[in-house]
Amino acid sequence: MSNALGRDLAKLVAAVDAAATECGHGAYGQRFHIMPPAGWLNDPNGLCQAGGVFHAYFQYAPFDVEGGVKVWGHATSRDLMTWDYVGAPLLPDEPFDCHGVYSGSALAEDGHIRVLYTGNVKLSDADGTYDYVNTGRRADTVYVESVDGLAGREFSQKRVVLASEDYPDDLTCHVRDPKVWRDADGRYRMVLGARRRVDGPHIESRFCAVSYTHLTLPTNSLV
């Protein structure tokens, strides 16, 4: 971890995980599906394969079974049936993800696991004016890559590659969950889920990524 908050959060999550593991899940524990040591599990994130190992990251709230601050849990498998929980490598330890490391995706390539995710921030609302749909929320797209090769348990300094101000003006604050892939031409592509400000169906925002550190928005980005 790159800062004191991250280091303290890592210790706290590890302590909760250790205590829960010691207690065990009993007769109701999952035997086939991924199950974290404690708390609440939601969206699978960053599913990828590297060196014969499958990686499944997931939304994990270790402190509350009804949800709460979201981290990324991490489990690995060689057969997609037996999973080992190996920790929580991505924690909300920066101003741009302080209310949760939300969903995203990963690619295993060039000796690294590369991740894009949504950093969730709910702004303080002393006056009660935010509805947290059109106002009061940030959802920046954040990039990290593993610093321990393809193990994917330790990650680099976080970097915002798309700030909330970069999204189209007709979208609400609900823009999240980047899915990235690489085309045959070598270009990276990314899709984000989004909600328009006017009533209507949810849409996708499509971004063309020239590289992980510089994303460009084409004119016909919305479908």
Name what the model sees in each region:
Residues 43-64, 85-87, 102-134, 141-145, ...:
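Hydrophobic core segments of beta-strands in well-ordered, beta-rich domains
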Residues 146-153, 215:
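Short loop/turn segments immediately following beta-strands, especially the blade-tip
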Residues 213-219:
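Conserved small/polar residues in nucleotide/adenosyl-binding loops
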Residues 71-77, 146, 209-212:
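Non-cytosolic beta-sandwich-type ligand-binding/adhesion modules
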